Structures are given as C-alpha cells and as structure tokens.
C-alpha cells in the first residue's frame, strides 16, 4: 500500500483536518439534499418540463449493476474531505463541492429538464439501490449533471494521491461512475459535457495550491488591457448567446458553453485578475482545469 498511496506531508495535526472535514460535511450534506430536493419540487410543479435526447441514446442499454458505481460517489465524496494534509486543502475541496452544487441547482431551477427513459423493474442489490435513489431523486435535475461535476472534482482529488496499481484502478472506477449516469438511465448525454464543464470550473476556481484566481482582484487602469478584456468578454457573450439560442434548434450548440467560459476567464484576467488565472507553476506546467 505504501507504494500505491502517495505520502501525505502533514503540515498540521490530522485531528484538525478531521474536525474541519466533519464540519464541512455537516453543512454540505444537508445543503445538498435541501437544495436538490427544492429544485426537484419546483420542477414537479410545472405543467411541462422539457428534455434533450439524441436519437442514438435510445440504443444505450440499461445495465442494472452499474447503480453500484453510481452510488459509490457518495462514499468518495466524504472520504475525499478526509484525504487532505491541512485545513486549507479541506476548505478548497469544499469550495469546489459548494460551487458545483450551487451552480447546478441554479441551472436546475432556471432550466429544468427531465429524464425520459423508464427503467425496467430490478431486484436484488441493484433493485434496493434504485429504490433508495427513487426515494429522494426525481426524473428532473438533469443538466448540468451534478453527478459528473462532482466526479470530475473527486477524480482529480484522488489521482494526485494514488500511485502504482491503485491509480489505473481509480481511473477505471471513475470511468464506470461516469458511464453509469447513462447505463442507469439517470441522465441523457448532454448532461455529461455540461456537468464536466461545471466540474472543471470548480477545479479552476479553487485550485489545489497557489492563489485563488479571484483573490486580490483590482480593476486594471491599463487602457490596452481593458480593451482586450472587453474584446474577450464580447466573445464570451456571443458564445453564450450562441449556446442559448442554438440549443433551441440543436442541443450540440450547448458545447459553445466551453469556449464561452474560456473567453470569460481570459477577459477576467485582462480586467485585473492577472496571469494567476492560468495557474502556471514555476516549472511552466499548468493545472488540468486551466
């Protein structure tokens, strides 16, 4: 195990890390169920809730046992908070969780979508897990997939800490979790890229180390930088408008949300945030999210 789990350099007593993680979990878990349930309730009160389904999705098989990896993200959600070497690490991971949950719930409320596939009856452990899931989850709260957003965050958190055989096993299990949102018929395809975008945004907003991209922001007085900021901001607005309007005709237009966010971040950099938004380290490498 020593060769498979990267050593964690403790910078403070681990007991403090556990307490901090427990406090965050005591807040995040109820917040999730309350806000997620509220969004579900609002959607259920609508006369009609739309859906985005590609024709080829009807060929996706229902694989009952994949509810197990689907559910496993709940375990890793809590364990990840404990897998930190200081309170700052806990705070940053919690910040990513909170970002994903808040943004996703806002989207669920403003743009509710519903899953259209009806699952067949299941028995045994899968049947039990589906029954528990159905006890609080409804066929709404689709895009962006909060499950995928949290998976991106949790996958990134563990991949920096595992070594040896555990690392490819982790990648494989993470793939199963990601695929399970389709094979359990919990989500439609478009929920995945939108959820991944949200997850990477949360990673960027709260990086593992270094300054936060929004810390110390001051509007620049440089005329050229302001002009460039406006130029990139305009590009972001146009891409966002293209995604919103294009989605009325073809859901593929929602992929424009990726360049829209990228352009917005560059505009933010020129406006005063500076080069730290690119999260480049001393050796020239950059974070996955940036």
Predicted regions located by residue number:
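Helix-loop-helix junctions and helix-breaking kinks within/between transmembrane helices
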Residues: 179-195
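Alpha-helical transmembrane segments and their membrane-interface exit regions
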Residues: 177, 196-207, 260-273
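Membrane-interfacial, low-structure loops and terminal tails that flank and connect transmembrane helices
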Residues: 1-18, 211-229
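Alpha-helical transmembrane segments
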Residues: 23-34, 172-175, 233-239
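Membrane-embedded alpha-helical segments of multi-pass membrane proteins
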Residues: 68-76, 145-150, 193-197
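Cys-dependent protein tyrosine phosphatase-like superfamily
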Residues: 59, 65, 70, 218-290
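Membrane-interface loops
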Residues: 39-58, 83-167, 171, 177-178, ...
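N-terminal transmembrane-helix/juxtamembrane module of multi-pass inner/ER membrane proteins
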Residues: 1-76, 120, 130, 268-289
């Amino acid at each position: 195990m020593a060769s498979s789990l990267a050593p964690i350099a403790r910078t403070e007593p681990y007991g403090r890390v556990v307490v901090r993680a427990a406090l965050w979990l005591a807040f995040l878990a109820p917040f999730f169920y309350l806000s997620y349930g509220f969004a579900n309730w609002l959607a259920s009160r609508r006369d009609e809730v739309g859906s985005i389904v590609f024709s080829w999705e009807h060929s996706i098989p229902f694989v009952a046992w994949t509810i197990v990896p689907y559910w496993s993200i709940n375990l890793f959600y809590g364990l990840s908070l404990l897998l930190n070497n200081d309170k700052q690490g806990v705070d940053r991971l919690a910040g990513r969780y909170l970002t994903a949950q808040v943004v996703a719930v806002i989207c669920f409320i403003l743009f509710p979508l519903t899953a259209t596939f009806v699952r067949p009856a299941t028995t045994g452990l899968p049947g039990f897990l589906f029954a528990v899931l159905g006890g609080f989850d409804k066929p709404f709260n689709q895009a962006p997939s909060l499950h995928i957003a949290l998976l991106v965050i949790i996958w990134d958190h563990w991949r920096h800490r595992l070594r040896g055989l555990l690392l490819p096993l982790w990648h494989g299990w993470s793939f199963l979790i990601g695929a399970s949102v389709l094979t359990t018929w919990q989500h439609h395809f478009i929920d995945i890229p939108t959820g991944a975008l949200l997850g990477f945004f949360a990673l960027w907003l709260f990086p593992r180390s270094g300054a936060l991209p929004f810390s110390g922001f001051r509007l620049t007085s440089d005329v050229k930088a302001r002009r460039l900021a406006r130029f990139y901001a305009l590009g972001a607005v146009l891409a966002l408008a293209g995604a919103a309007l294009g989605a009325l005709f073809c859901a593929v237009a929602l992929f424009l949300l990726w360049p829209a966010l990228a352009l917005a971040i560059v505009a933010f950099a020129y406006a005063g945030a500076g080069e730290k938004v690119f999260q480049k380290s001393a050796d020239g490498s950059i974070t996955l999210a940036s």
